[in-house]
Amino acid sequence: MITALLGGVGLSTGAEAAGGAGNPAVPSGGLLAAAASGPATGAGAADLNAWSAAQRVNDLKRRAHRLPVIPAAAPAAAVARPSVQAPTAAAGASVLVLYDTTGPYGYLGELYAMATANLAGHFGTVTAKPVSAYTPGMVEQYSATFYVGSTYYGGSIPDAVPAAFYQDVMTTAKPVDWIGDNVWNMANAVGIENFKKKYGWDPTNSYFSTNGSVGTINQVTYKGQTLTRKIPAGADGGVLHPALSGAGYPQVTQLALATDASTGAVTPWAIRSANLTYVGEIPFAYVSESDRVVAFEDLLFDALAPAATERHRAFVRLEDISPGSDPTELRTMADYLASQNIPYGINVIPVYTDPRGVYNNGTPQTITLAQAPDVVAALQYMLAHGAVLMNHGYTHQYGNVNNPYTGVTADDFEFFRSHVDAANNVVYDGPPAEDSTAWAQSRVTAALAGFAAAGLPRPALWTTPHYAASAADYRVFGQNYTARLERPLYFAGTLSGAPVNPGRYIGQFFPYAVKDVYGTTVLPEDIGNYEPVPVNNHPARLPADLINSARANLAVRDGVASFFYHPYYPVAPLQQTIDGIRALGYTFVGPMDLAN
């Protein structure tokens, strides 16, 4: 399972499988991560567990009418905080993303809002701001509005949602997607019967628990696909069970259904009536390539591109190619892919270095592309047979230390520090001490010089080594390349304008190209990679697993099944994967096609 990432421990989030001569691996990453432990900021599994516990307690109190809610104060100028507007994407929608900021875990709201804003960046221009900064009529300025309710208001936490937002949702004809908490406060604010008459259900009688328990909801069914929901014990805040009003009230469309493994009970996971789409949980924690987040990724089309044509494309890239690679293996891969008329990407590291001789009998070794003519010839052969050159870091390792494995190219992180803990988890320690815009640019400049010195074209695409870097680094990459193809990290402070907190972040993968909150086009990598052996507490990932993830992603009406493969593995597993994905109806395209 790919877990979520909230600072500290990388339980696979944001990292792509390692290569190198010894081929250790960091499994491919996920979307919000719950760390096994966290940094001094307090982010990690403890916070997610505490948040879910508070949610369960508040839900029981609300059911017992013991959770008084203090309404939001009238807005004042001092309440307004900076909003972040991403560049306009290919389509023309305009999107407002509102999020919570108060309570002991208020910072989660910004992380979830970034995940929502990034997905919305596939469709057009995105503006994100705290819900407390909402002003009357704002919903009318956008094609659609998304509210991510992550703070369960009540008791000692006053409602931060302005009354104007509740009223505007009720009166606007514009689509509103409400995710998670506080829809019951809207019903109380506008009148329960008024809410029922428009939407056909009663949030004030809808709860996350049944008979005192949130149950064991482990799957969501959407558009014929069974998606997983794997929440660790003690970390599940539940899925809201909407109380549908029935006869005499508007019909409610049940868009997705959740199943409780312990009872077999089925409840709506997402519903729609009138202008309101409601999703019964925030789907960004504990996700995988076949997770219920896939349903949410498709639901955005209903609000932002309802006329989108069904289209299913696939993409494969060959990973961790360096001056130390075997040119015969590269040509073998090129011949197979060319025989199948499959365009593909080649992620190339321009400098191979083994600073302590880990794989060279103790003798340090460094090889540039210019010093590896056979590899360069193989790369040119690949480019002539359907490949697109991509830049995968400068050295794909850091200094002469284990980070976290060997210090050798393709094994280790380059732009983030890490270590492996006693439980065999990869722990994300944060950016290097010398991290800065200038430092990142110096490595990019050196990498590009390495390609030029070998007579290769300048790559237009970038993939961060193991996907992990600081916010400043990601922006540098975006300034030097047409697009990034990866599963990035997004740090607290990016939306709010506060200093970026390197210990609090969310990792995310995408089923389609997006304009992210860093202002860069990010191309999808969403079904992972072939990995024949378990590593760092993650199971092997075989062709059948990749194919199953591609099948789940058929639920996204214009989605991409994007994966990567290391050329030091045999051709057969790659062939099995490609054949299986093609059999599902996917068409393989090149990386530059993914932006369209």
Residue ranges: model-predicted function:
Residues 151-231:
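A glycine-rich, often tryptophan-bearing local segment used as a flexible ligand/cofactor-contacting loop or short
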Residues 426-514, 569, 573:
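Catalytic domains of cell-wall/extracellular-matrix polysaccharide-remodeling enzymes
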Residues 32-38, 42-142, 310, 337, ...:
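Aromatic-Pro/Gly-enriched surface loop or interdomain linker
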Residues 313-322, 327, 438-441, 445-461, ...:
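Catalytic grooves of carbohydrate-active enzymes
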Residues 124-130, 298-310, 328, 332-355, ...:
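C-terminal domain-boundary segment and adjacent tail
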Residues 209-274:
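Catalytic beta-strand/loop cores that center a nucleophilic Ser/Cys/Thr
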Residues 104-185, 356:
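Helical hinge/lid and interdomain linker segments adjacent to catalytic or ligand-binding clefts
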Residues 184, 343-470, 527, 560-563:
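Metal-dependent polysaccharide deacetylase catalytic core of the NodB/CE4 family, i.e.
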